[in-house]
């Protein structure tokens, strides 16, 4: 009886923990909803915990998608996170389970966003991190980027620098959950790369860092006890590029974060491009059929609102995993 009870408790905790995981999966450009058209949505909502792995680039098991979202230099994009694939409702927190931590956004200039593997240099264009809440007794009680994300239905508005050159970029949105970060390897990182094509702009050349390499497991923004009182917090990685922006944690929803509603505003159409059949990020599947695009094994290939490639790489087929919401290559 006791064994059954313990097993049940463990199962319940694991289920609750899994439910608290999340993915960035949709993109808005100047208030227009592009959904997941240009997002390399991870096949799982589980986090990356090894900051030395290639999965730090665009998450585990991700591959290029068939489209790129057009973005004007100096405009705003809004990244959107939710716990479950294709669930864009506001009924649940974007990432629950007291997964408090910063929200960071990077860009990487690439020759072709539909084939880039994330190995090029990255520069940080945005952060919403931490702010002390008066009279708080622990970091859990303070203001965090994740709390802002949860308050704004998973949305975070980000300015694209106006002085960067035109061309293709990977846009990398990231949450670092710090609820178990008091020990090495405990931080949970959730990231998604979006494929975008920037028009306009200038000739600036921001300094860059590499993933992996930009973070260390011992960084004070990675190894930290948020359950104790905090007097400061410094996010890992480089400073925000001068042409980027920051948001003060706890400052409330702004712009598209509060006004953009799924199904009640303008929508955008991303440009279709041929996609290589090989995986772009470490951990992704390989293989592929001939011509056009193909989706790597275990990647999304269909479902409600999905507009990406529907052909699976050689050796796998597109199957409904959670019909009608989600299908993946298996």
UniProtKB/Swiss-Prot annotation:
E.C. designation(s): 1.14.99.56
Keywords from the named record: Carbohydrate metabolism, Cellulose degradation, Copper, Disulfide bond, Metal-binding, Monooxygenase, Oxidoreductase, Polysaccharide degradation, Secreted, Signal
A matching Pfam family: CBM_1
GO biological process: cellulose catabolic process
Annotated positions binding Cu(2+): 21, 99, 190
Entry annotated with the keyword Oxidoreductase: yes
InterPro entries named in the record: AA9 (IPR049892), AA9_LPMO (IPR005103), CBD_sf (IPR035971), Cellulose-bd_dom_fun (IPR000254)
Domain of life: Eukaryota
GO cellular component terms listed in the entry, alphabetical order: extracellular region
Reactions this protein catalyses: [(1->4)-beta-D-glucosyl]n+m + reduced acceptor + O2 = 4-dehydro-beta-D-glucosyl-[(1->4)-beta-D-glucosyl]n-1 + [(1->4)-beta-D-glucosyl]m + acceptor + H2O
One term of GO molecular function: metal ion binding
Similarity field: Belongs to the polysaccharide monooxygenase AA9 family.
Protein name, entry field: AA9 family lytic polysaccharide monooxygenase E
